[in-house]
């Protein structure tokens, strides 16, 4: 603490003026010893005769207060030692102990800028200028002279700035204490703009600032590549759940993602309707894992991008620790159930669309159309028995074999449409349009064709049939992929 001969001295029971901040060294620790020394210094200076005060006493006391050392009595003058031994000072020392410990000492008022600014209306304090006259004080203090709130960190170069210490009148203890409590010029985090309790508590505790608290969440965390392992759904997260069903659920998601999504695109950029369809399928087949379906999709897409980045093969089989015979059975049952439900939903859609736009047909012709529709629905059942189509020896599938599937279905269609005995019903695709054409008239039905108009499908029905065909193809490709993985599993086990 730097006391100079020209600086004013505050009274005992009054808060210091704004100019006192130029005297107080805020680098000193705020301890009871520091408060006692400060108050003793004020009381001793008031008891001294103004005519006997010299600049030597202030220079000597400067080094004594700055050192913050227990050897205070050795640096005091003999007259000051006698005053400290007097009963009055001993009594005031005890009062200082109690006041500083209870946190209501006068030294604490220097920490609050609002209390220090309230002294501007008080009478002027006496000035130690040797003539005993009380001169008015200048209250026009600059921003650097204002008291500083110690609860907030000061940015480097502001308020305190770089400390400059006088070289005269300072001992080794004083220099040591200045080095210890010097201002840090290292860049720190900016001070909080609001003096809230949380910010003060964070600063006082000295803990590193948590930059994640209070920050607005990212727009979508699906694109970050965290350290999630490829298929590492922790088993401890699924306590009370069947681990075999968890494995089947993981493979179920993998198959759906492989068939419907681009594995190099993050989930946030995938088509929303496809993501929602996969989540709904997972909810139907694995209701206990419906909450983690989206996370499972995101994790698998991340692993695919990571493996592509590392140059690994994407058409790899399922890792052995993530599958088992029971899990494969559960997966096959789930796939079959999902296929049946998808076909049922599409049939209902077609039925509803046909009810909305009825076509005036004869009963015989409506029975023929119904038989044709049922023969179309038998496509997946026939596709199950077909040999999988391999491309370049890999596990990929193609749709090139579906033309033969339609020709194989022609005998069954002709059996169900018994009236057309002269030839099979034509179910071939014309011009790339995936819609079945009306039956080809035969000589035996020419008379019927002349009297009855040819059935024409409405655009709504055509769209519904196309959706049905696309669903069948996806189901067939899905089952082909499942068969390939099962075959690879058998080869790995043997």
Swiss-Prot record:
Residues that bear Phosphoserine: 189, 354
Region (Disordered): 1-24, 43-243, 410-459
Pfam families: HTH_NOL4_2nd (PF23079)
Keywords linked to the UniProt accession: Phosphoprotein
Biased composition range(s): Low complexity: 100-120, 443-454
Keyword Phosphoprotein appears in the UniProt entry: yes
Nucleotidyltransferase recorded as keyword: no
Basic and acidic residues: compositionally biased ranges: 229-243
Chain intervals with Polar residues compositional bias: 43-55, 410-425
Regions of compositional bias (Acidic residues) in chain numbering: 219-228
Protein name: Nucleolar protein 4-like
Protein species of origin: Mus musculus (Mouse)
């Amino acid at each position: 603490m730097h006391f100079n001969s020209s600086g004013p001295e505050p009274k005992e029971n009054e808060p210091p003026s704004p100019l006192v901040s130029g005297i107080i060294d805020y680098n000193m620790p705020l301890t009871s010893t520091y408060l006692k020394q400060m108050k003793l210094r004020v009381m001793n200076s008031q008891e001294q005769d103004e005519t006997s005060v010299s600049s030597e006493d202030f220079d000597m006391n400067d080094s004594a207060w700055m050192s913050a050392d227990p050897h205070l009595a050795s640096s005091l003058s003999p007259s000051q030692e006698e005053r400290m031994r007097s009963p009055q000072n001993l009594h005031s020392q005890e009062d200082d102990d109690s006041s500083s410990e209870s946190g209501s000492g006068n030294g604490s008022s220097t920490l609050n800028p609002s209390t220090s600014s309230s002294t501007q209306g008080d009478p002027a304090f006496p000035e130690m200028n040797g003539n005993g006259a009380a001169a008015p004080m200048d209250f026009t203090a600059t921003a650097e002279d204002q008291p500083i709130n110690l609860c907030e960190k000061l940015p480097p170069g502001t308020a305190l700035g770089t400390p400059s210490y006088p070289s005269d009148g300072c001992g080794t203890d004083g220099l040591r204490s200045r080095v210890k409590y010097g201002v840090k010029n290292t860049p720190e985090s900016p001070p909080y703009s609001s003096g809230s309790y949380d910010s003060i508590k964070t600063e006082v505790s000295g803990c590193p600032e948590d930059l994640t608290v209070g920050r607005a969440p990212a727009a979508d965390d699906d694109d970050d590549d965290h350290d999630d392992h490829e298929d590492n759904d922790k088993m401890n997260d699924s306590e009370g759940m069947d681990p075999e069903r968890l494995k089947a659920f993981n493979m179920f998601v993998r198959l759906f993602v492989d068939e419907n999504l681009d594995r190099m695109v993050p989930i946030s950029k995938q088509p929303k309707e496809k993501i929602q369809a996969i989540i709904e399928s997972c909810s139907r087949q694995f209701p206990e894992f419906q909450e983690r379906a989206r996370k499972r999709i995101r994790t698998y897409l991340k692993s695919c991008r990571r493996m592509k980045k590392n140059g690994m093969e994407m058409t790899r089989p399922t890792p052995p620790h993530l599958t088992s015979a029971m899990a494969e059975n559960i997966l096959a049952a789930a796939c079959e159930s999902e296929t049946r439900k998808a076909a049922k939903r599409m049939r209902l859609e077609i039925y509803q669309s046909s009810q909305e736009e009825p076509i005036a047909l004869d009963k015989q012709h409506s029975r023929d159309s119904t038989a044709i529709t049922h023969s179309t629905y038998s496509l997946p059942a026939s596709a199950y028995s077909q040999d999988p189509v391999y491309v370049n020896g890999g596990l990929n599938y193609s749709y090139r074999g579906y033309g033969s599937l339609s020709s194989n279905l022609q005998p069954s269609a002709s059996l169900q449409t018994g009236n057309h005995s002269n030839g099979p019903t034509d179910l071939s695709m014309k011009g790339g349009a995936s819609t079945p054409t009306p039956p080809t008239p035969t000589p035996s039905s020419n008379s019927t064709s002349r009297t009855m108009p040819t059935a024409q499908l409405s655009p709504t029905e055509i769209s519904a049939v196309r959706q049905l065909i696309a669903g069948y193809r996806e189901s067939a490709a899905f089952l082909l992929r499942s068969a390939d993985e099962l075959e690879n599993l058998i080869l790995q086990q043997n």
